[in-house]
């Protein structure tokens, strides 16, 4: 009798173990192999840099237009009011905005006039990013009206929420510094800050004006701790080679246009050049930086 009981117990335990193994996660069901998480990936450190090693430097501001094909991985998947996740991927604004709400990244306000991280955004300001707001509005309870109450008696105060439409972020502005490190004999660049640019709309008509305004600034070295664990789509269409946003910025795998350089008058390119001339001026600045490094060597 004892042998039969032990045999039944062993059989039951084996069946329970098999059932536990049969329970698959959603991620495992959508792939032929188990994907390792990026949460433990560590940021690649910059090479040590001393002031005495920098023989030349220049600050550059550039904008990444997410409507360009090469920059689509920054924009998709689109947002429907909540952060959309497709195969562990989120858009760049979803990654940054979620980290700001959690307190993992510090957001700096007064973004239109200040890109030097002087003013941290308060919690109230963070809740209002991109026009998001909560307010009490009067609404009519039509069920009460159907029961015979007047519209005035059926009026109620309800909480109305307007979410931050992250799909309107169509550009990102980068502040970076190019420098020549004589210790390593290389021209190098490091991103200092980044800001999402939201499409401007006319307050009366609600129509797009064609302009863009920065919502906030983020200190890039701090954001790297979040970006290193945020997976991004590989445009080579090789899902086995998984990349993160930090990889994309580190390898400069994006298209952009220079909009400003450090100068005595501190002007943007579009303040003294217009249209095609502004694009040519951006190319001139880019070529000037290239020639600066090229002219240091003899061939």
Language-model features, listed with the residues they occupy:
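Bacterial Sec-dependent N-terminal signal peptides
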Residues: 1-28
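Glycine-centered flexibility motif
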Residues: 15, 103, 190-193
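A domain-level signal for the mature, folded cores of soluble proteins
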Residues: 21-182, 201, 220-299
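Short linear, low-complexity motifs centered on an aromatic residue
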Residues: 205-222
């Amino acid at each position: 009798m004892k042998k039969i009981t032990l045999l039944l117990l062993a059989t039951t335990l084996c069946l329970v173990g098999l059932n536990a193994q049969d329970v698959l996660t959603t991620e495992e069901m959508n792939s032929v192999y188990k994907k390792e998480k990026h949460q433990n990936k560590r940021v690649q450190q910059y090479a040590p840099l001393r002031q005495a090693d920098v023989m030349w430097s220049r600050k550059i501001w550039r904008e990444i237009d997410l409507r360009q094909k090469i920059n689509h991985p920054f924009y998709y998947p689109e947002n429907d009011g909540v952060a959309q996740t497709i195969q562990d991927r989120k858009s760049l604004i979803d990654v940054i905005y979620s980290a700001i709400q959690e307190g993992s990244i510090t957001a700096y306000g007064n973004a239109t006039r200040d890109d030097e991280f002087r003013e941290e955004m308060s919690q109230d300001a963070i809740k209002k990013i991109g026009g998001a707001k909560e307010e009490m509005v009067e609404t009519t309870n039509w069920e009460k009206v159907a029961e015979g109450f007047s519209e005035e008696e059926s009026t109620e105060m309800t909480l109305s929420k307007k979410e931050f439409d992250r799909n309107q972020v169509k550009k990102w502005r980068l502040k970076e510094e190019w420098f020549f490190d004589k210790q390593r004999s290389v021209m190098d660049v490091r991103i200092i800050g980044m800001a999402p640019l939201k499409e401007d709309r006319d307050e009366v008509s609600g129509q797009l004006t064609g302009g863009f305004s920065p919502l906030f600034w983020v200190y890039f070295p701090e954001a790297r701790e979040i970006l290193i664990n945020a997976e991004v789509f590989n445009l080579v269409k090789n899902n086995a080679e998984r990349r993160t946003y930090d990889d994309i910025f580190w390898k400069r795998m994006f298209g952009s246009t220079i909009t400003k350089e450090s100068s005595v008058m501190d002007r943007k390119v579009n303040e003294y050049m217009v249209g095609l001339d502004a694009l040519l001026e951006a190319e001139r600045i880019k070529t000037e930086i290239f020639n600066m490094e090229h002219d240091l060597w003899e061939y």
